[in-house]
């Protein structure tokens, strides 16, 4: 990871933890990291609770002045009105969220979100003053065909073609090969680097070096404390979007410490 980009360790809780469990987790995570003298200025930690827990997490973080960011797992493209079950970007922003996950493979699969909808989500998140974490990645079929890099880059390009330079610079990309999510299988560090580098080069071609050098690219897919150090040692991998391991507070703290350690080795 390039030292000028602050690593981001993002824990996606998916549909786990009620609001009481969520606040307990946040408290324990901060305690574990503080005990390890964690430098939150050199490595960012963010959590993604369910909608029902966001307000509880906000109250805790603001009251105790905790150095943990948080965000939402999805967002509606509409602002208000008769859209039962939807939650707008402005509503999420008013809860103090910094980030919103957009285009996660589970959203694409179970709540069919097409490319146009994902573009609209990204624009809604940006308009509300937050940063979108755009999830991209290939299935086994694309990988079998040898088109995984083109596929991931194409997913990013489908979004960035509608953004200007200022908007693109605020984008965070999470490369999550679908075949590695929740399976225990993980991309090799070189595969993760190849994908991240291809995405960054495409951003450079479209927007220039200033934008491409500023965009953080995360890896997701069966990340654990056993493989995190080698993954984040890759020059274009700037952190993680973590699923299963993010439900274990001690494991998540270990991964965060490894991400922080990677910044020290590059200075």
Swiss-Prot record:
Subcellular location(s) of the protein: Cytoplasm
GO molecular function: triose-phosphate isomerase activity
Reactions listed under catalytic activity: D-glyceraldehyde 3-phosphate = dihydroxyacetone phosphate
Signal peptide (UniProt feature, chain positions): none
The protein's annotated pathway: Carbohydrate biosynthesis; gluconeogenesis; Carbohydrate degradation; glycolysis; D-glyceraldehyde 3-phosphate from glycerone phosphate: step 1/1
GO BP: gluconeogenesis; glyceraldehyde-3-phosphate biosynthetic process; glycerol catabolic process; glycolytic process
Described purpose of this protein according to its UniProt entry: Involved in the gluconeogenesis. Catalyzes stereospecifically the conversion of dihydroxyacetone phosphate (DHAP) to D-glyceraldehyde-3-phosphate (G3P).
Family: Belongs to the triosephosphate isomerase family.
Protein name per Swiss-Prot or TrEMBL: Triosephosphate isomerase
Organism: Bifidobacterium longum (strain NCC 2705)
Underlying gene: tpiA
């Amino acid at each position: 990871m390039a030292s000028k980009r602050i690593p981001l360790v993002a824990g996606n809780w998916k549909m786990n933890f009620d609001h009481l469990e969520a606040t307990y987790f946040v408290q324990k995570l901060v305690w574990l990291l503080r005990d390890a003298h964690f430098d939150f200025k050199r490595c960012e930690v963010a959590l993604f609770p369910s909608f029902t827990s966001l307000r509880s997490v906000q109250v805790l973080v603001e009251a105790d002045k905790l150095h943990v960011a948080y965000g939402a797992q999805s967002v509606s493209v509409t602002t208000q009105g008769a859209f039962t079950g939807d939650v707008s970007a402005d509503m999420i922003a008013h809860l103090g969220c910094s980030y919103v996950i957009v285009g996660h493979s589970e959203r694409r699969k179970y709540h069919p979100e097409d490319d146009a909808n994902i573009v609209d989500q990204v624009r809604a998140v940006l308009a509300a003053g937050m940063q979108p974490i755009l999830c991209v990645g290939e299935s086994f079929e694309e990988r079998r065909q040898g088109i995984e890099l083109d596929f991931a880059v194409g997913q990013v390009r489908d979004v960035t073609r509608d953004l200007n330079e200022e908007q693109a610079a605020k984008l965070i990309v999470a490369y999550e090969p679908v075949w590695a999510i929740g399976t225990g299988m993980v991309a090799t560090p070189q595969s993760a680097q190849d994908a991240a580098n291809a995405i960054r080069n495409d951003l450079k071609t479209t927007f220039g070096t200033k934008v491409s050098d500023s965009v953080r690219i995360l890896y997701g897919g069966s990340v654990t404390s056993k493989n995190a150090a080698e993954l984040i040692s890759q020059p274009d991998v700037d952190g993680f979007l973590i699923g299963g391991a993010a439900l274990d507070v001690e494991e998540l703290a270990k991964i965060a410490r490894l991400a922080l350690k990677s910044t020290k080795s590059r200075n």
